[in-house]
Amino acid sequence: MCEGEKQFSYFCMDYGKGKVIYMYVTHTFEPVCDEKSRILILGTFPSVKSRENAFYYGHPQNRFWKVLAALLDENIPSSIEEKKKMLLKHGIAIWDVISSCDIEGSSDSSIRNVTANDIAGLLAASRIEKIYGNGDKACRLYDRSEERR
């Protein structure tokens, strides 16, 4: 249940009499993790830029990779392979709470009709000890998915 990339699937839905276009989007790239991963950082759902780049935190203005590199005393990774290598070197896994949803652009506040990823399955197949959300929405969605189990 670790590594691998796929493409996203889309179809448009018009909610709100033509005012807002939500897209049904399926998250199709896998978590980054391995047998040494002890920390899991959960996001909500990839931004439009991340979906285009087929990897996490792909918008050039997103500070995730800069902050993480500073915390880990590493150079800022530029390629997907460098990002994966930095994460795994430090026992960090990343994934998103949401498997599919309706979303307007990249806005977490617009997310609706959520289907959660199988985080429990990832945890059972790994040695993750700590889970951190990268924001309030990710934490709330994770808590909600755990309550349903």
Ranges and model annotations:
Residues 147-148:
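Conserved small/polar residues in nucleotide/adenosyl-binding loops
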